[in-house]
């Protein structure tokens, strides 16, 4: 029997839920889909975020009574190799939006394998990459040529 698997929803352990929710909702446009039932915002221990067909869960890394005053840098180092990749047809627009919101990142770059990518880190140090297949100059020339032909055909009909 074939497996019917639909979607995925990663779970990230975060140091400060309010900071993480603010980042994912206010900066990246996610909305809160569900929360734990025994807390009041912004003191949730668990949230389920959704943006279109992208799902992400956040859980506090510590129970409130055991949370240290500041994040342990070793904890961030342990997930330094974790990165969430988001499909973003207009990577430059994502970059501009992040800059408008005061989020620092390097400018998008085209990887050797042809993906235009923008990397940054969330408040807990998890890697985030917004990417899309980069158009080659030849593809852009062909698209422009096809658009001009379409315009010319419409002009001849009118």
Ranges and model annotations:
Residues 1-21, 81-84, 133-158:
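N-terminal beta-strand motif that seeds the catalytic metal site of vicinal oxygen chelate
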Residues 2, 11-56:
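Core segments of cupin and vicinal oxygen chelate
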Residues 8, 43-45, 82, 116:
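Residue-level marker for the onset of beta-strands and adjacent loop->beta junctions
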Residues 14-18, 63, 77-124:
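Vicinal oxygen chelate
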Residues 34, 119, 130-136:
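Short beta->alpha transition motifs characteristic of CBS
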Residues 36, 69-75:
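Short, P/G- and charge-enriched loop/turn segments at secondary-structure junctions
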Residues 52-56, 62-65, 91-92:
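Short, charged/polar surface micro-motifs in flexible loops or helix N-caps
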């Amino acid at each position: 029997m074939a497996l019917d698997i639909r979607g995925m929803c990663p779970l990230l352990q975060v140091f400060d839920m309010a900071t993480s929710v603010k980042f994912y909702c206010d900066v990246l446009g996610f909305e809160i889909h569900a929360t734990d039932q025994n807390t009041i915002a912004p003191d949730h221990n668990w949230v389920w975020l959704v943006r279109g067909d992208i799902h992400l869960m956040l859980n506090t890394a510590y129970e409130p009574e055991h949370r240290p005053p500041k994040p342990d840098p070793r904890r961030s180092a342990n997930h330094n190799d974790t990165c969430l990749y988001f499909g973003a047809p207009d990577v430059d627009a994502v970059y501009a939006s992040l800059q408008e919101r005061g989020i620092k990142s390097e400018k998008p770059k085209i990887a050797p394998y042809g993906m235009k990518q923008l990397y940054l880190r969330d408040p807990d140090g998890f890697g985030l990459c917004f990417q899309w297949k980069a158009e080659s100059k030849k593809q852009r020339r062909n698209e422009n040529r096809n658009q001009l032909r379409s315009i010319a055909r419409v002009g001849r009909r009118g």
